[in-house]
Amino acid sequence: MNETKTDSTVNPDQSSQELVFFNYHEYLVPGSDDTSLVINHFPNIHTDLSSSTFKETRIIRIPRVYHTVQFPDLIPQFSCYYPGSEPGAITSTQLMSGSFDDNSFNESSSIPSLENIISRSEFENIVSLVNESLAVAFNPMSKRMLLENLLDLLSGGLFLSLLNFLGIYSFTKRKLMELESQIDSINQINEKKGVDFKIISPRVTGYLSLDFQITKPR
């Protein structure tokens, strides 16, 4: 009978390297001259598909991250990297390389028109606001969350039902409502200023990504 031998030793030179962060929503499609276009903005599924808004706007998806807080499966957090500045981003000196699905893309992860719409500091402030609000709202070890859960357990689920009935709501829901109000306020300010930038509530995406609506890149 033949024996199969396996070598479990690992060559030090083949040891795994530290992973580099990138926006996992991006993907490549074939371009011209053997180049690949980086698809980094997407159809605006948050509006009526037959509307002019759908035709004139696109969505940027900021990925969720899992290394910045405890309980990352319970506390949604999003990348603070400006699109195209991620350590694993694809870089290129080309501004525009081609079109795909009637939209303009290039060979890099950056979106050329984005800095004309929102600055890096504004972007980081918005993402930080969302992250901090979600960290407070969903922290399972906060005193208020623990107390509410204990009272709800002892009352057989009546405590939170009573809070909802009285319009007081749970601590988590109140914090999420505050975040919704802040997002609406920022969107209204941008609209008054004529800035083509809108924050989509992370609740709409199930906290899987933080979506921003921008004018369709040309």
Curated annotation (Swiss-Prot):
GO terms for CC?
A: endoplasmic reticulum membrane; endoplasmic reticulum palmitoyltransferase complex
GO terms of biological process kind: protein targeting to membrane
Is Iron one of the keywords UniProt gives this record? Answer: no
Q: How does the record classify its membrane topology?
A: Peripheral membrane protein
Where does it live in the cell?
Endoplasmic reticulum membrane
Transmembrane region(s) = none
Q: Does the keyword Magnesium apply?
A: no
Annotated keywords: Endoplasmic reticulum, Membrane
**Which Pfam families does UniProt cross-reference here?**
Erf4 (PF10256)
Which protein family is named in the record? Belongs to the ERF4 family.
Instruction: Cite the record's note on assembly.
Output: Interacts with ERF2.
Please explain the role this protein plays, according to its UniProt record.
Answer: The ERF2-ERF4 complex is a palmitoyltransferase specific for Ras proteins. Palmitoylates RAS2, which is required for its proper plasma membrane localization.
Would you tell me the protein name for this molecule?
A: Ras modification protein ERF4
